Amino acid sequence: MNIYTSILVLSYLIGSIPFGLILSYIGGLGDIRKIGSGNIGATNVFRKSKKLAVVTLILDSLKGFVSVMLAKNFSSDQTFVFMSALFSIIGHMFPVWLSFKGGKGVATLLGSIMFIEYKFVIYFTIFWIIVFVIFRYSSLSSIISTISIMLLVYTHYSANESITFLVMSLLVIVQHIENIVRIIKGKENKI
């Protein structure tokens, strides 16, 4: 296995660390998958503990950040750096430790973006807050912010990076399909 393959595998493994689940046990909440939406991410943890949700958000973001930083230390190939982010997000969504049932990847995507282009995190956050203030849906805020950043990547990066980021974005959106259906039916929980 060459160094590039090793970094992609390591990015997947880093991404697959289920911090929301680990912190929910440490914090005495039990199995977060049996609470609220059943998701292991920060939004679901938020339903039981704001403090643990913040820590979950930070640690899930760090998974993407560390994976991208690792790739950047071994290669100046920007496409490879984006691929490392993709593998970290896939790890978060489909962790080997949890029978491939993980989170939605928003925080890990955000951490990846933070290392690649920190200004995009500011835009993401602004879009997220605006949509959240208007609609009160975390899921809708995440989807619209992800699409917005996808458009920014398309205008600032090459075709290879843009396609890789498109795949990341589509994965995040697909992970939100149930939320989209609930929003349409008027059954999505507001925060």
From Swiss-Prot:
It catalyses: an acyl phosphate + sn-glycerol 3-phosphate = a 1-acyl-sn-glycero-3-phosphate + phosphate. The keyword Cell membrane applies. InterPro entries: G3P_acylTferase_PlsY. It holds the Pfam family G3P_acyltransf. One of its GO terms (molecular function) is acyl-phosphate glycerol-3-phosphate acyltransferase activity. It is a multi-pass membrane protein. Its main location: membrane. GO terms for biological process: phospholipid biosynthetic process. It is found in: Cell inner membrane. Keywords: Cell inner membrane, Cell membrane, Lipid biosynthesis, Lipid metabolism, Membrane, Phospholipid biosynthesis, Phospholipid metabolism, Transferase, Transmembrane, Transmembrane helix. One of its GO terms (cellular component) is plasma membrane. SMART domains: G3P_acyltransf (SM01207). The chain crosses the membrane at residues 7-27, 51-71, 80-100, 115-135, 139-159, 161-181. Pathway: Lipid metabolism; phospholipid metabolism. Its EC number is 2.3.1.275. Probably interacts with PlsX. Belongs to the PlsY family. Catalyzes the transfer of an acyl group from acyl-phosphate (acyl-PO(4)) to glycerol-3-phosphate (G3P) to form lysophosphatidic acid (LPA). This enzyme utilizes acyl-phosphate as fatty acyl donor, but not acyl-CoA or acyl-ACP. This is Glycerol-3-phosphate acyltransferase.
